[in-house]
C-alpha cells in the first residue's frame, strides 16, 4: 500500500470514485480537489481546500502532484479535461486517468464528435450543424426526417439538449440555445439531429487508447419527473445492469461503437486513456450513438462501481500504462444497483442552499449507499443542501425490482426542510415495463377464477331450482335477484321473517367424505328451522358458496342437497352466489351460508310470552343426530385421537354399514312439514326454539323473565352417538348440554292441556313444565336438568366413560360497534329481539326481491392492511345494487361472518361497516350470523356473505325486456373504482408488479391498499326517488359486477339486441389503466372482469333521457354512454365498447406524467375549492392534478380552513396592502411561480385581474361563472336571469382573458329555473352544477384534452363542450 491518488471534483460521481479507490490495498492516501463533506468521511480520503490549491490552475495541480508523489490523477468532471488538464499532467509525467484536450473533443464539441462518428462509420442519428438560427430553423422545417433534437455543441452541464415534441418546439429551442445563447458560447454552434425512437441506455468503457473494455450497461433518467417528463437534468437516477440491451446487441456495441471509436482515435493520432462513455438509443435498426462522453457518467458511476469486483486503482493504472488488455475485469453477478437522486426545490432552473437535511443513514452498508452531490454541513455538523442535485440514495439487491423499491424507500426517508426534495419514484421501472410487455397477459382465469366454470354451474343447477318452484315464484336463476309474489299466498297481514345460517365445520367432514348432498340439506334445514321460531312459512331460499377452486360437479351436489330440502319444505330455491377465492380458501376448501325468507301473519308471530302459564309443557322433537353444532372442535379432537372416520360406526347406523363419518354427517332434521300446519293454525304452539347453539342455551331463549324449567331425560332417550362422542373425547355431560342438542332438535311450548305432541308430532317427548321462578332463587340457573348424566354415563361407558373435557363456543355474538343500526318504520322486534318486517299497505301487488353476494378477495386486502372498516359497506352494496336492478326498494339486510380466530374487536369493526352500508342503503339491519371456524380459516382470515331483501310493485319490476328497443339510450353512473370484483386478478397483478399494499399507488397519492379498499358505491339513494315515480322512463338497470361490462349488460337484453358504448363519454378510472399495464391485461379481459368506470348502467327510452339526467347528472355524475342497437349476427358479442383502447392509452399516458400543479384563488367560503379537493382525491374521477397552493385575498375565510383541513399550503395576500392591481398581481405571480404552479383556478376570487397577469397565465387560468355565458356576465347574474324571465340558468367554466367573462368556454352546466325561485334557491341549485362542472373542466385541462386557448373560438365553444 504505497500509492497516493488525486481525484479532481466534488460531486456524487467523485464521492463514488473515492469510495471505490479506498477499497484498494494498493492505495494509502486519496486527495480530493476540492472534495466534499461526504468524501472527507471516506477512509483514506482528505479534501484539498480550493484556497490552498486552485482547481483551475492546472500548472499548480501538476506541481503539487509531483511534490506529493501522486501516482495517479483521476479527473471526474468534463470541463478540466476539455480545457487541457490531462495534457498538462502528461507533459509533467504524471499519469492522468482522462484524455487530453484533443480526446475530450468527443464530448466538448458535439459537431466534431458527430463528424468523427461519420468519418469512422459509427452508427448514429443523421444531423446537421449550424451557427445561424434562421438556417437551423429552415432545416428543421424542411428536413427529410424528424429533425427535432437540438443540441448545444459545447459543454452545458448535461442540460444543453432539447428533445422537442414538434417543429415549433424545436425552433423555439434554436432561438434559446443559439439565438439567446442560453448556455453561453457552448451554444454558439448548434447540432440538429434526427429524432430516434427507442430506449436510451449508457455503456461506459475503460480504455488505454489501444484496447477497450465495456462496463456493465446502465440506464440514466435525465428528465426531472416520473414518466420522463419535465425538463432535462444532469440525471435523476440510474440503475445497473440494464436488461434492456441484449447480449448480441452489447457485443455489437463493443465492435461497432467502442472499438471503432478507439481505432478512429488512433487513426487521428489522438492519445486517449480513461473512460469512453457511449450514450445509446436502442432503435429498431440496432443501437445508435446519441453522444460520447470523455469521463465517468453521473449518476451512472454511482451504480456501476459498487458492482465492480476488480480493484479500480489497478484498472485505472492499466489504462494509463497501456496494459488494459492484460487485466481481466470482474463484476458481481446476480446483483443489481439502483440509485435515486434527491434534488433541491427549483432544480434544474434554480437550486436551494442551506436547507436542513434529516433522515440520512449514519453509515453506508454493503446493500445501502449514500453519495453526496451537493451537500454541506454547518457548524453543528448538520447536513444542509448545497446545490441542485444534493445526494443519491442507492440500494443493492439480488432482485432489480427489490433494489428499486428499497432505493425509493430510502429516498423517501430523507427530507429537506422548507420546500422539500424532488426525486423520482420510477427509477428502473422501464426495465419492469419491458418485462411486463413481453410477459404473457394475465387473465381472471390465470388468477384462479374461472368465469366459465361459474356459468357452467348456473346451467347445471337451473333444473334443480325449477324443481323447487312453488306458487309465488317469478323468473329463474341468472338474473340480478330472486323474485317472489306475495299475492299468490293467502296472507292477510303478511310479515316477512328472515333467517341466516351456516353449517360450521361440518362442511369439512362432508368434503372429506363426499357427503355433499347431506351438507347442502343441512344448510337449508338450519335456515328453514330458524324461521319456525317466528311462526313463519319458509317460501324462498338463497345460498352462498365460497371455495378456493370451483369444481362444478361438487358444487352442483351441494346445491342438489339444498334443493332436496327446499322441496321437502315446499320452499323455492330462487338464487345464490358462488365465489371462487383462491387467496382466501385453499383448493378443496369451502364454506356455505344460507338465507331463508318466510311469511307469517302479523297475529301469528312467535314467541307469545304473553300467553305463557305455569304448567305449560316444554316438548322436545328428536334430532337426527348432531345436526351442525360444534364440529370444529369435534373434528379437531377426533383427528388428534387418530380416530378413522371411514371405519364402520359402532353407534347409530353402524349396524347397517354406515361409517362414523356418515353417522356424524347425518343431515339436520327438517321440521317444516311437521310443524307448519300447527303454527298456521295458531291455537296451540306458543313458542319454538331451534336447538343450534346447545340445548341449555336454546331452551333459555324460551323462558321470559320469571319462568324456569327442569328438563327431565327420564323418558327421553339420548342417541348413542352422544355417548360414543363423550367417551371417545372424554367430554363432560355439562359441555354436551351446553354445546349440543343431545338428541333434541326443536323445543316447543304447548298448553298443559295440549295433546298435540302425542297425536301429531311423532317422536315428541315432554321435557318438562314451566314454573314460576321463586323470588329468592338468586343466581340459580333457570334451566335445570335431571336424569341426563346417568343415561349418558351408560352410553359412554363402552367407549371410555365421561371425562371433564369442555367444548368451546363456535357461534358468536358480535359485540356492539357503537354504530347505530338503521331501522325502517316497517321493521319491528318480536319478544326475544328478532327483527321482522311488515309489508307496507301501499303496495297493491308486492314482489319480494332477494339478493346475495360476497366481497370476494377484496377481503384479503382488508385483512393484510388491517383496514376492515369498509368491507361491510362493499358487502351491502354488492347485494342491494343487485336487487335495485329488479326495481326493488331495499328493506332489510342480513350478514354471515366466519373467521379462523375469534377477535371480538375485528368482528365489531367489520359489522360496523355492514351497519353503515345498511344505513346508506336505507335498509334495516336484521342480524349477523357469526362463527369461529379454525378448521376452515387461517387465524387472521374471515369471509363475509350478505343477503338483501327488497320490495317492488309488480308493475315496477325491472328489466322491462319487451320494451327495450334499438335507439334506447344508455346512461352510466360512475363506479368508485374496482368495487368488489376481480380481486383475484388484482392480487396476481400486484405479485407480477412486485408491489405491496402499503406502497404508494402508481396512479394516486394514496397507498395501493387505500385505493383498492375504496368501498363499492351504493346506488340506492341515487335512484330510489326516481324509481318510485310511475313514469320514470327507466327500462332496465345493470349492476356491473362479476363478469364486467361484457357479461352484466346482456342480462337485461333480449338475444336480438346489443349495446354500443363509447369509452370517450365516461372517465376510465386510472386504477384500470394501471392494472392493464402492470398485468398486460387485454382490453377484452378487462371489460369481462371489471366495471371499467361504470358501476351501474341504465337503459332509458330516448324521450326520457333529459328527465333522468336532470335527476342524476350533477349529484351522481351520470352521463350518456351509449345506445341499444340491433344485433344482426347472433355470434357477435352483445356489448361493443368503442374507443376503449384509445381511452385506455390516454389514461396510461396521463399516468406516465407528473400531476399538474394547480393553485386555487379564493375570497370566501371555498365550496368550489372543496369540490376540486374532493374530485382530485377521488382517483376514480381521473382529475390528474394536485392543488399545491390556495391563495385568499381575505383573511379568516372558510376556504382557508378547508385548505388547512386538506393539508394544502395556503396564504393570505391582501389586495389592500398593495398600491395597484398590477403590483398585487406581480406578488401573486411570485408566489405562484415559487410553488411551480402550472394552472390556476379562480373559485370565487373577487378581484379583477390585471392585463399583464392574464396574459402571463393565458391558457392556464380558468374561472367558474354562475350563468350560461355569454348570457349575464359580471355580477348579480341570478337576479338578472330571474328578471329576464329565463327558464334556464347554470354555470360556465371558461378561460380567463382580458375581458369580463369573455374567455373561451370549457364546460357549461344548465339548471332549470322553477316557479317560485328567488335568488337564494337558484344560487343553491347552481352550486350543485358548479361542483360538477369545475372538477370536470380541470380534468380536461390537466389531461391535455383541450386545445390551446389561442386556437379556441370564443363564439363557438361547442367543440370543447362536446369533448367532455
UniProtKB/Swiss-Prot annotation:
Where in this chain does the record put each ATP-grasp domain?
A: 114-321
What Enzyme Commission number(s) does the record list for this chain?
Answer: 6.3.4.13, 6.3.3.1, 2.1.2.2
Give me the residues that bind Mn(2+), please. 291, 293
The residues that hold ATP are 140-202
A Gene Ontology biological process noted in the UniProt record is:
'de novo' IMP biosynthetic process
- Source organism of this protein record: Drosophila pseudoobscura pseudoobscura
Q: Which residues bind N(1)-(5-phospho-beta-D-ribosyl)glycinamide?
A: 1166-1168, 1327-1330
Q: Per UniProt, where does (6R)-10-formyltetrahydrofolate bind?
A: 1221, 1246-1249, 1263, 1297-1301
Q: Where is this region: AIRS?
A: 435-1154
Role of this protein? Trifunctional enzyme required for de novo purine biosynthesis.
Known pathway: Purine metabolism; IMP biosynthesis via de novo pathway; 5-amino-1-(5-phospho-D-ribosyl)imidazole from N(2)-formyl-N(1)-(5-phospho-D-ribosyl)glycinamide: step 2/2; Purine metabolism; IMP biosynthesis via de novo pathway; N(1)-(5-phospho-D-ribosyl)glycinamide from 5-phospho-alpha-D-ribose 1-diphosphate: step 2/2; Purine metabolism; IMP biosynthesis via de novo pathway; N(2)-formyl-N(1)-(5-phospho-D-ribosyl)glycinamide from N(1)-(5-phospho-D-ribosyl)glycinamide (10-formyl THF route): step 1/1
State which gene encodes it.
ade3
Its UniProt entry gives the catalysed reaction(s) as: 5-phospho-beta-D-ribosylamine + glycine + ATP = N(1)-(5-phospho-beta-D-ribosyl)glycinamide + ADP + phosphate + H(+); 2-formamido-N(1)-(5-O-phospho-beta-D-ribosyl)acetamidine + ATP = 5-amino-1-(5-phospho-beta-D-ribosyl)imidazole + ADP + phosphate + H(+); N(1)-(5-phospho-beta-D-ribosyl)glycinamide + (6R)-10-formyltetrahydrofolate = N(2)-formyl-N(1)-(5-phospho-beta-D-ribosyl)glycinamide + (6S)-5,6,7,8-tetrahydrofolate + H(+)
**Pfam families listed in its UniProt record:** AIRS (PF00586), AIRS_C (PF02769), Formyl_trans_N (PF00551), GARS_A (PF01071), GARS_C (PF02843), GARS_N (PF02844)
Entry similarity comment? In the N-terminal section; belongs to the GARS family. In the central section; belongs to the AIR synthase family.
- Annotated region GART: the residues are 1155-1364
Task: Name any one GO molecular function.
Answer: metal ion binding
Protein name per its UniProtKB record? Trifunctional purine biosynthetic protein adenosine-3
Keywords for this protein: ATP-binding, Ligase, Manganese, Metal-binding, Multifunctional enzyme, Nucleotide-binding, Purine biosynthesis, Transferase
Q: Which PANTHER family match?
A: TRIFUNCTIONAL PURINE BIOSYNTHETIC PROTEIN ADENOSINE-3, TRIFUNCTIONAL PURINE BIOSYNTHETIC PROTEIN ADENOSINE-3-RELATED
Residues of the active site are: 1265 (proton donor)
Amino acid at each position: 500500500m504505497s500509492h497516493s491518488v488525486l481525484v479532481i471534483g466534488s460531486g456524487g460521481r467523485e464521492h463514488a470514485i473515492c469510495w471505490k479507490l479506498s477499497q484498494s490495498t494498493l492505495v494509502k492516501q486519496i486527495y480530493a480537489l476540492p472534495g466534499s463533506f461526504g468524501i472527507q468521511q471516506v477512509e483514506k480520503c482528505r479534501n484539498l481546500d480550493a484556497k490552498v490549491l486552485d482547481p483551475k490552475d492546472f500548472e499548480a495541480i501538476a506541481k503539487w502532484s509531483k511534490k506529493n508523489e501522486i501516482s495517479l490523477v483521476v479527473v471526474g468532471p468534463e470541463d478540466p479535461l476539455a480545457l487541457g488538464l490531462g495534457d498538462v499532467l502528461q507533459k509533467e509525467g504524471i499519469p492522468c486517468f482522462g484524455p487530453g484536450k484533443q480526446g475530450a473533443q468527443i464530448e466538448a464539441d458535439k459537431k466534431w464528435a458527430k463528424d468523427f462518428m461519420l468519418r469512422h462509420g459509427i452508427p448514429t442519428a443523421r444531423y446537421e450543424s449550424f451557427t445561424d438560427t434562421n438556417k437551423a430553423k429552415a432545416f428543421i422545417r424542411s428536413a427529410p426526417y424528424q429533425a427535432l433534437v437540438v443540441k448545444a455543441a459545447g459543454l452545458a452541464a448535461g442540460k444543453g439538449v432539447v428533445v422537442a415534441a414538434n417543429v415549433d418546439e424545436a425552433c423555439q429551442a434554436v432561438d434559446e440555445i443559439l439565438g439567446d445563447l442560453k448556455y453561453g458560447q457552448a451554444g454558439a454552434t448548434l447540432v440538429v439531429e434526427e429524432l430516434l425512437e427507442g430506449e436510451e441506455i449508457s455503456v461506459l468503457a475503460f480504455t488505454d487508447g489501444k484496447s477497450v473494455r465495456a462496463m456493465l450497461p446502465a440506464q440514466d433518467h435525465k428528465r426531472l419527473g416520473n414518466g420522463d417528463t419535465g425538463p432535462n437534468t444532469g440525471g435523476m437516477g440510474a440503475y445497473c445492469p440494464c436488461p434492456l440491451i441484449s447480449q448480441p446487441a452489447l457485443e455489437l456495441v463493443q465492435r461497432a461503437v467502442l472499438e471503432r471509436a478507439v481505432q478512429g482515435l488512433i487513426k487521428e493520432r489522438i492519445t486517449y486513456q480513461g473512460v469512453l462513455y457511449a450514450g445509446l438509443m436502442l432503435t429498431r435498426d440496432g443501437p445508435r450513438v446519441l453522444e460520447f462522453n470523455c469521463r465517468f457518467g453521473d449518476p451512472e458511476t454511482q451504480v456501476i462501481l459498487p458492482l465492480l469486483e476488480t480493484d479500480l486503482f489497478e484498472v485505472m493504472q492499466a489504462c494509463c500504462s497501456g496494459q488494459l488488455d492484460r487485466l481481466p475485469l470482474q463484476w458481481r453477478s446476480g446483483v443489481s444497483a439502483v440509485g435515486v437522486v434527491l434534488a433541491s426545490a427549483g432544480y434544474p432552473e434554480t437550486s436551494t442552499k442551506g436547507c436542513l437535511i434529516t433522515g440520512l443513514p449514519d453509515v453506508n452498508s454493503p446493500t445501502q449507499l449514500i453519495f453526496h452531490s451537493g451537500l454541506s454541513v454547518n457548524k453543528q455538523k448538520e447536513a444542509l443542501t448545497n446545490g441542485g442535485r444534493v445526494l443519491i440514495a442507492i440500494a443493492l439487491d439480488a432482485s432489480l425490482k427489490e433494489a428499486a423499491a428499497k432505493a425509493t424507500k430510502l429516498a423517501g426517508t430523507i427530507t429537506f426542510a422548507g420546500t422539500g426534495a424532488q426525486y423520482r419514484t420510477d427509477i428502473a421501472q422501464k426495465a419492469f415495463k419491458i418485462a411486463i410487455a413481453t410477459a404473457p397477459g394475465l387473465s381472471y382465469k390465470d388468477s384462479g377464477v374461472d368465469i366459465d366454470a361459474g356459468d357452467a354451474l348456473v346451467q347445471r343447477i337451473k333444473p334443480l331450482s325449477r324443481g323447487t318452484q312453488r306458487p309465488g315464484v317469478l323468473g329463474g336463476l341468472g338474473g340480478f335477484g330472486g323474485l317472489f309474489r306475495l299475492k299468490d299466498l293467502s296472507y292477510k297481514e303478511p310479515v316477512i321473517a328472515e333467517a341466516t345460517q351456516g353449517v360450521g365445520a361440518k362442511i369439512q367432514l362432508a368434503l372429506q367424505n363426499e357427503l355433499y348432498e347431506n351438507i347442502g340439506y343441512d344448510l337449508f334445514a338450519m335456515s328453514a328451522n330458524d324461521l319456525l321460531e317466528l311462526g313463519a312459512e319458509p317460501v324462498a331460499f338463497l345460498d352462498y358458496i365460497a371455495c378456493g377452486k370451483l369444481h362444478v360437479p361438487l358444487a352442483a351436489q351441494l346445491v342438489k342437497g339444498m334443493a332436496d330440502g327446499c322441496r321437502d319444505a315446499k320452499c323455492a330455491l330462487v338464487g345464490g352466489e358462488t365465489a371462487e377465492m383462491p387467496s382466501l380458501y385453499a383448493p378443496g376448501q369451502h364454506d356455505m351460508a344460507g338465507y331463508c325468507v318466510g311469511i307469517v301473519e302479523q297475529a301469528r308471530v312467535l314467541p307469545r310470552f304473553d300467553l305463557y302459564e305455569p304448567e305449560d309443557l316444554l316438548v322436545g322433537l328428536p334430532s337426527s343426530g348432531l345436526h351442525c353444532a360444534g364440529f370444529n372442535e369435534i373434528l379437531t379432537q377426533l383427528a388428534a385421537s387418530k380416530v378413522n372416520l371411514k371405519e364402520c360406526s359402532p353407534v347409530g347406523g353402524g349396524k347397517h354399514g354406515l361409517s362414523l363419518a356418515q353417522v356424524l354427517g347425518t343431515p339436520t332434521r327438517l321440521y317444516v312439514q311437521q310443524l307448519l300446519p300447527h303454527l298456521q293454525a295458531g291455537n296451540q304452539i306458543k313458542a319454538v326454539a331451534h336447538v343450534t347453539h346447545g340445548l341449555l342455551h336454546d331452551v333459555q331463549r324460551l323462558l321470559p323473565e320469571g319462568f324456569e324449567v327442569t328438563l327431565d331425560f327420564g323418558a327421553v332417550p339420548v342417541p348413542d352417538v352422544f355417548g360414543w362422542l363423550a367417551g371417545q373425547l372424554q367430554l363432560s355431560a355439562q359441555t354436551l348440554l351446553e354445546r349440543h342438542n343431545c338428541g333434541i332438535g326443536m323445543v316447543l311450548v304447548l298448553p298443559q292441556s295440549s295433546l298435540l305432541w302425542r297425536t301429531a308430532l311423532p317422536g315428541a317427548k315432554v321435557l318438562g313444565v314451566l314454573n314460576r321462578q321463586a323470588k329468592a332463587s338468586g343466581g340459580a340457573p333457570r334451566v335445570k336438568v335431571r336424569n341426563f348424566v346417568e343415561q349418558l354415563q351408560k352410553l359412554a361407558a363402552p367407549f371410555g366413560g365421561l371425562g371433564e373435557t369442555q367444548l368451546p363456543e363456535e357461534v358468536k355474538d358480535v359485540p356492539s360497534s357503537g354504530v347505530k343500526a338503521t331501522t325502517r318504520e316497517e321493521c319491528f322486534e318480536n319478544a326475544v329481539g328478532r327483527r321482522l318486517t311488515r309489508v307496507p299497505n301501499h303496495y297493491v301487488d308486492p314482489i319480494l326481491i332477494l339478493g346475495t353476494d360476497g366481497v370476494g378477495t377484496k377481503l384479503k386486502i382488508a385483512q393484510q392492511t388491517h383496514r376492515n372498516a369498509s368491507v361491510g359497506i362493499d358487502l351491502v352494496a354488492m347485494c342491494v345494487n343487485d336487487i335495485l336492478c329488479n326495481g326493488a326498494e331495499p328493506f332489510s339486510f342480513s350478514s354471515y361472518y366466519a373467521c379462523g380466530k375469534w377477535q371480538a374487536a375485528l368482528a365489531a369493526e367489520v359489522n360496523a361497516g355492514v351497519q353503515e352500508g345498511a344505513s346508506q342503503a336505507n335498509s334495516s339491519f336484521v342480524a349477523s350470523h357469526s362463527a369461529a371456524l379454525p378448521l376452515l380459516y387461517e387465524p387472521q382470515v374471515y369471509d363475509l356473505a350478505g343477503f338483501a331483501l327488497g320490495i317492488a310493485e309488480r308493475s315496477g319490476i325491472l328489466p322491462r325486456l319487451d320494451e327495450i328497443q334499438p335507439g334506447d339510450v344508455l346512461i352510466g353512473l360512475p363506479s368508485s373504482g374496482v368495487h368488489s370484483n376481480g380481486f383475484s386478478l388484482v392480487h396476481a397483478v400486484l405479485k407480477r408488479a412486485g408491489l405491496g399494499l402499503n406502497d404508494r399507488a402508481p396512479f394516486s397519492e394514496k397507498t395501493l391498499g387505500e385505493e383498492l379498499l375504496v368501498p363499492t358505491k351504493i346506488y340506492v339513494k341515487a335512484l330510489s326517488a326516481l324509481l318510485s315515480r310511475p313514469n320514470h322512463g327507466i327500462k332496465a338497470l345493470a349492476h356491473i359486477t362479476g363478469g364486467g361490462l361484457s357479461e352484466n349488460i346482456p342480462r337485461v337484453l333480449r338475444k336480438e339486441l346489443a349495446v354500443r358504448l363509447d369509452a370517450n363519454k365516461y372517465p376510465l378510472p386510472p386504477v384500470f389503466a394501471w392494472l392493464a399495464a402492470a398485468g398486460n391485461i387485454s382490453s377484452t379481459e378487462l371489460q369481462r372482469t371489471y366495471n371499467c368506470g361504470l358501476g351501474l348502467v341504465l337503459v332509458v327510452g330516448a324521450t326520457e333521457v333529459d328527465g333522468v339526467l336532470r335527476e342524476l347528472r350533477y349529484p351522481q355524475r351520470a352521463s350518456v354512454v351509449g345506445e341499444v342497437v340491433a344485433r344482426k349476427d347472433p355470434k357477435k358479442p352483445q356489448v361493443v365498447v368503442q374507443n376503449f383502447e384509445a381511452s385506455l392509452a390516454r389514461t396510461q399516458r396521463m399516468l406516465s406524467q407528473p400531476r399538474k400543479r394547480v393553485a386555487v384563488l379564493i375570497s370566501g367560503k371555498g365550496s368550489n375549492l372543496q369540490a376540486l379537493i374532493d374530485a382530485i382525491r377521488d382517483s376514480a374521477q381521473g382529475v390528474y392534478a394536485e392543488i399545491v397552493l390556495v391563495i385568499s385575498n381575505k383573511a379568516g375565510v372558510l376556504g382557508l380552513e378547508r385548505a388547512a383541513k386538506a393539508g394544502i399550503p395556503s396564504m393570505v395576500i391582501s389586495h389592500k396592502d398593495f398600491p395597484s392591481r398590477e403590483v398585487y398581481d406581480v406578488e401573486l405571480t411570485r408566489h405562484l411561480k415559487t410553488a411551480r404552479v402550472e394552472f390556476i383556478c379562480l373559485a370565487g376570487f373577487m378581484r379583477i385581474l390585471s392585463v399583464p397577469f392574464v396574459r402571463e397565465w393565458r391558457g392556464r387560468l380558468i374561472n367558474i361563472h354562475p350563468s350560461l355565458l355569454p348570457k349575464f356576465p359580471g355580477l348579480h347574474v341570478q337576479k338578472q336571469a330571474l328578471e329576464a324571465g329565463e327558464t334556464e340558468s347554470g354555470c360556465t367554466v371558461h378561460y380567463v382573458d382580458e375581458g369580463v367573462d369573455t374567455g373561451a368556454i370549457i364546460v357549461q352546466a344548465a339548471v332549470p329555473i322553477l316557479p317560485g325561485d328567488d335568488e337564494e334557491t337558484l344560487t343553491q341549485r347552481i352550486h350543485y352544477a358548479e361542483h360538477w362542472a369545475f372538477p370536470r373542466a380541470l380534468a380536461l385541462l390537466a389531461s391535455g384534452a383541450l386545445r390551446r386557448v389561442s386556437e379556441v373560438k370564443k363564439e363557438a365553444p361547442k367543440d370543447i363542450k362536446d369533448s367532455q
